[in-house]
Amino acid sequence: MSFTVAIVGRPNVGKSTLFNRLVGKKLALVDDTPGVTRDRRPGDARLMGLTFTIIDTAGLEEADEESLQGRMRAQTEAAIDEADLSLFVVDAKNGLTPVDTALAEMLRRRGKPVVLVANKSEARGSDSGFYDAYTLGLGEPTPISAEHGQGMIDLRDAIVAAIGKDRAYAKEDVAVTDVDIPPSESEADGEDEEPVYDDTKPLRVAIVGRPNAGKSTLINRFLGEDRLLTGPEAGITRDSISVEWDWRGRTIKMFDTAGMRRKARVTEKLEKLSVADALRAIRFAETVVIVFDATIPFEKQDLQIVDLVLREGRAAVLAFNKWDMIEDRQAVLADLREKTDRLLPQARGIRAVPISGQTGWGLDKLMQSIIDTDRVWNKRISTARLNRWLETQQIQHPPPAVSGRRIKLKYMTQVKARPPAFMISCTRSDALPESYTRYLINGLRADFDMPSVPIRIHFRSAENPYESKKKRT
């Protein structure tokens, strides 16, 4: 993008609504409750021929530096410093407050271009608030309605005037990127060579877990900066915030998510929106890191989150955080491994890494586990290898007999990856017990080195081409 714009203002003036309008989708949570946005959220904006990076920010308030509101303010000030231009949003419907005046003074001291935006100008009685905005000394306010999309052309013109026409419409060099070409039919059948894992493609990783497990602290440690709001208060993160960084030459896009509590405890509308946002991040990700608090691991909600991730078909890695607070580490690690195998039988072999987001201990090992797990998630196995394996499995443990006739597994092929899914042609597929499916899945994990990912097997009854002729005679 050619330039960066920060949306700033006091709480509940419509900043996130404007952000969603400019990016063309509902990325930021919107609610009547003040202070919904806490972290700074970037997005790709398009406005009447302009393309730029837009940053949604927390509502600015006067607050002590160490308080939650003070730390939110620091995040917003960092966004202002990062941006080339600020959109200072005021509420034309409800008028100015002393906080607006203080923020205008702060923006003037920064010395960067500012566009004054009078939102909610469609409301009855908004004229008074619009004209009051002139008193802020930031030039002519631009009247808009972020909710209804009114005034967007005027906003575009104000941005161009503030940043300059050359900068606003500057052309960027377009990087040549790899195109993901689907395999041909012969490649999909796997008769030729199995495809090589591409470790240069960007990787999408969601960080999930219970509230206060240390998810945001972990991402900040990866980035080497206080990019995300953290603190002792549970439930600080509300939006799913994405950040990009480079790990050993590979682009990693990480999604910080709101803490996920048991459904019965989620009563507030805003928390329900936050959890729904976290679920969307899981579905968009390729690999999901489930962060456990190592001091109180394996709460019921931890297990439910792991089960949810696997049911969504994502690759999963466990991170036992706060390892710096553990004293007898060897004994605790052995106990965690035993509980992982016992309490998560559906995730046999899942990678589990002890880490400390506070000190950075174990993060390289965690990242390598993420890469290794993604490699398995993308794995394809040739049809020839699968059918040799299937024959061996039936010799070692034959399928059960039904009405005196043994079920025969005739043919196996991989129908997709991400996650790996297989189709087996057999007789009497409806009579094959679930226990035999588990036997095959466990065999695939062990023989083809496929831990940490869900494996799906679909059975199809083999058709007898002479069956219809027999019925006619």
From Swiss-Prot:
CDD domains: EngA1 (cd01894), EngA2 (cd01895). Residues 3-167, 203-378 form the EngA-type G domain. It holds the Pfam family KH_dom-like. GO terms for molecular function: GTP binding. One of its GO terms (biological process) is ribosome biogenesis. GTP 1 binds at residues 9-16, 56-60, 119-122. GTP 2 binds at residues 209-216, 256-260, 321-324. It comes from the Bacteria. Residues 379-463 form the KH-like domain. Keywords: GTP-binding, Nucleotide-binding, Repeat, Ribosome biogenesis. PANTHER family: GTPASE DER (PTHR43834:SF6). Associates with the 50S ribosomal subunit. Belongs to the TRAFAC class TrmE-Era-EngA-EngB-Septin-like GTPase superfamily. EngA (Der) GTPase family. GTPase that plays an essential role in the late steps of ribosome biogenesis. NCBIfam families: GTPase_EngA, small_GTP. This is GTPase Der. The lineage of its organism: Bacteria, Pseudomonadati, Pseudomonadota, Alphaproteobacteria, Hyphomicrobiales.
